[in-house]
């Protein structure tokens, strides 16, 4: 079995052991994505990247979040600028789309140092518990920081330097 086949099998059966990780784990001490692994940077160029856990926390704590039917308008309490974060749900191993348009999950570039199999996310949505990443919970106006398995198909909201 090739390494990629082995990894796919382990992911499919949720049998990844921390010892199977060779990057972003205890042995290499990395706590943030390298630029070479950042999909925003690879797709849109050097100025773009996935935001850190600290940047998501800043957004969550210093902005007004207004539900717009299929996502949030997030407005800065400091300068009034805003962005829109759609409730795009997330994708699982079989590529099924889950919880759209009630929830949104957004990756940060920061790993959960307590569990290297996971990274920090922001969760937004209508109801329920935060199991993955950064999540918003519209209707309850709930935005949470969560830790989720790195192989889940969550959205990204790139930022520029």
What is each model feature region?
Residues 1-161:
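Conserved positions within compact, well-structured domain cores
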């Amino acid at each position: 079995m090739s390494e990629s086949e082995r990894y796919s099998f382990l992911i499919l059966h949720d049998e990844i052991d921390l010892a199977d990780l060779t990057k972003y784990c205890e042995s290499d001490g990395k706590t943030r994505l390298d630029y070479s692994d950042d999909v925003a940077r690879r797709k849109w160029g050097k100025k773009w990247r996935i935001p850190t856990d600290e940047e998501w926390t800043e957004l969550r704590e210093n902005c007004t979040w207004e539900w717009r039917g299929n996502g949030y308008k997030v407005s800065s309490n400091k300068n009034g600028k805003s962005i829109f974060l759609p409730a795009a749900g997330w994708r699982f191993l079989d590529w099924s789309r889950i919880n759209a348009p009630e929830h949104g999950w957004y990756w940060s570039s920061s790993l959960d140092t307590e569990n290297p199999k996971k990274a920090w996310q922001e969760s937004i949505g209508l109801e329920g518990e935060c199991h993955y990443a950064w999540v918003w919970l519209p209707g309850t106006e709930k935005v949470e920081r969560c830790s989720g398995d790195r192989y889940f198909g969550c959205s990204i909201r790139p930022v520029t330097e």
